[in-house]
Amino acid sequence: EFRTGEVNRVKECTYTPGGKGLNVSKPAAIAGAEVVATGFIGGHAGSYIEEALKPLGIRSAFYRVAGESRSCINIWDKKNQKQTEFLEPGFTVSEEDFSGFEKHFKELVKQADIVEISGSVPRGLDGTAYQRLVRIVKENGKKVILDTSGKLLTMGIEACPTMIKPNGDEIKMLTGRKVNRMED
């Protein structure tokens, strides 16, 4: 049982590389797809992520920046069946960093069949970040799936991704309608 304001003795800890993009990459690699993971990475946590992906069969092609990749602490309270997350802010990416990443990304896209762009972006980037990346993929004649939310999703859609993967909240944001069933 997780108790706030007290010392909590932990019985089990696991460390796994995560984030929306890597959570898509893992089952794809298990299913036999050749997967290349990219994005921004930094510091000791970034090095850990790269090493932890190797045994999963995921090729690491991250773009290194100054700072430390963020960590997420996820506490699972078995007794109450509740999850609590603590998300670090992570590093800030400059426009110069993003321009360098775009060049790196263009080279990776040339080797890809399908590109998934997902999750959030680091501080310092605006809502056009995924729009710019979707355009790069489309300019190379490749398929692109966009799985994000908020301004990144609305602006990303303007670049015409092949597919989007919105959840119920994102569908409501896009259409103004609440979705309760597949028929909606």
Walk through the language-model features, giving the residues of each:
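Cofactor-binding loop segments of dinucleotide-utilizing enzymes, especially the Rossmann-like FAD-
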Residues: 40-43, 65, 78, 120, ...
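A glycine-rich beta-to-alpha transition motif near the start of alpha/beta enzyme domains, typified by
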Residues: 34-61
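Conserved phosphate/ATP/ADP-binding segment of small-molecule kinases
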Residues: 127-184
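Conserved phosphate-binding/catalytic loop of the ribokinase/pfkB sugar-kinase fold
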Residues: 75-111
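Glycine-rich phosphate/adenosyl-contacting loop at the front of the ribokinase-like
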Residues: 1-38, 47-48
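Gly/Ser-rich phosphate-binding catalytic loop and adjacent alpha/beta segment
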Residues: 63-71, 92-97
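Short acidic, glycine-rich surface-loop motifs adjacent to enzyme active sites
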Residues: 112-124
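Anion (oxyanion) recognition and catalysis
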Residues: 29, 54, 138
